[in-house]
Amino acid sequence: MNKKIIRVPADSVGDVCGYSMIEYHTDITEKIKLIENIPQTIPINKTLQVRGELYTRHQEPAYSQRIAAGYLRNKANNPHQGLKFVAFQIINTEMDQFTMLQFLRLSLSFDVTSWSLTEVVHIEKYRRSWLNKNLYCGTPTDGIVVKINDYKLQQTRPNYWQMAIKY
């Protein structure tokens, strides 16, 4: 069964714009439906909350965030050319990070970014590549997040299982 996306309150997409400039509990469902790479239906019959980021390609991160926030605040339901969504989390799931990202991409048709690195030295090489702008060409990023993959291990480190690295 395909379940339609029926309501998107702004408080559930706070991460979408990178900062909260939208009044909480504002229904932005119709705006979200106009973003071309967000699936209109999902092939499961349960409530699911997906978090991610709205962005525009080839813009500085702060400018891209302002464009996304402006689009969501604007009262008109006009499509925004070039606005994209990348998913990074399903709320309240017990899937490990890799499985969750695969599920988002393969089963639910969301765009995701995912790298699977197992050694600290590889994470440092990845960080240097990102700082040198060798990654995410054309996609505005002001940081990367390193996460522990294993769900059970995450539960033993509730505040420390993920770490943001910013410019």
Predicted segments with their positions:
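RNA/tRNA-interacting regions in translation and RNA-turnover enzymes
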Residues: M1-Y167
